[in-house]
Amino acid sequence: IRLSLVGSEMCIRDRSVQTAEGALTEVHSMLQRMNELAVQAANGTNSKDTDRKAIQDEIDQLNTEIDRVAETTKFNEIYLLKGDDGTKQINLNAHDAGLKGSLTDKGDGTATFVMDELKAGDAVSIGGKNYTIAATTTDTDDLITKASAKNTDIVINGKTYKYQAAKGAGDDSSAAAAKAGYYEEGVAWAAGAGKTADGLKTLAAAGSTVEAAGKKLTSLSTAEATAGVSASNQSVITDKMAYVKAQTELLSANQIGDTVGNAAVYKAGTTAAATLADATNKFDIKVGKAEVANTLSFSLHVGADADMTNKISVDIDTMNSTFLGIKGLNVTDKNGTAATYAIDAISDAISKVSSQRSALGAVQNRLEHTIDNLDNVSENTSSAESRIRDTDMAKE
């Protein structure tokens, strides 16, 4: 009876799970603060040299403290958040760099991203900068054809060409009547000055801007099309240039926390980066990896005897910045793009901590019931033991 009593009381005293969960509560709080700072750094009104540097300083301190908590939290000389002996490589989550499209993380260290297909005149944001997709002369010719079919006014390189409707009743001899169905620059209809839709197309040569029916297209010269960008307006780029820029941002977003150097972005179906000559809207991604300590595993013995069913298994991953995918987090770039990508990385870190806390919480809830039962056993065993000790053997 004494053996059972002492064993039960020893089981009740174990607080290793509570210690680990309590430490993770603080890690969780620090990550929430880092998220606030990253959002603040992503704001375009910050100064690179002052505001963002101050924000970076606090993020660095929080990262250091997270590592310290992971390195030093222990119960009965067992380090709970440091991991176990040996190392392993883990895959980080794939990110879409805020681009519009469909991201598929396959869970095997690879992902695919299909960016929304870009067409002439589309507006797109890449890496925090806004661009307009350039047109070809085929695109501008098609716009003129569709606009003329609806008798819509057309603007070419800033000049408006108004459509002249058919003559009205009693207007047989007017110059306007003679030019019915034609386009003319301005509102005056001088004899012989009318133009057909095909005539307007000759004015919309490569390098022109055409506006009609609520749509605006800018075509590029041959040299500009080869370079992928307008010489006079750097925000006008070809669709292929947009895909190349998107590839660069995808790589930046997926390199955060990649301590192994595994992250890469390729043109879909290849192991080479897309170029201006062959870029498409489809990408293959090798996600970042981190080398971390093995998972710590131990068992809590919750019974007074040697029955192996009196075991509750506990698994705790190392909870340092490397495992969380935020090691070396940087928010000091000029336009706040790095801070924007950092928000995704911090969100992943919060999810990891939440998952570990959830697992520990489940064990702790089970332990609460186990402890209540052990309290019951201990109390009744103690009562029985006392009665036996107090028995008057002479009377018996």
Give the location of each predicted region.
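Primary detection of the long, small/polar-rich alpha-helical "axial" segments characteristic
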Residues: 2, 7-396
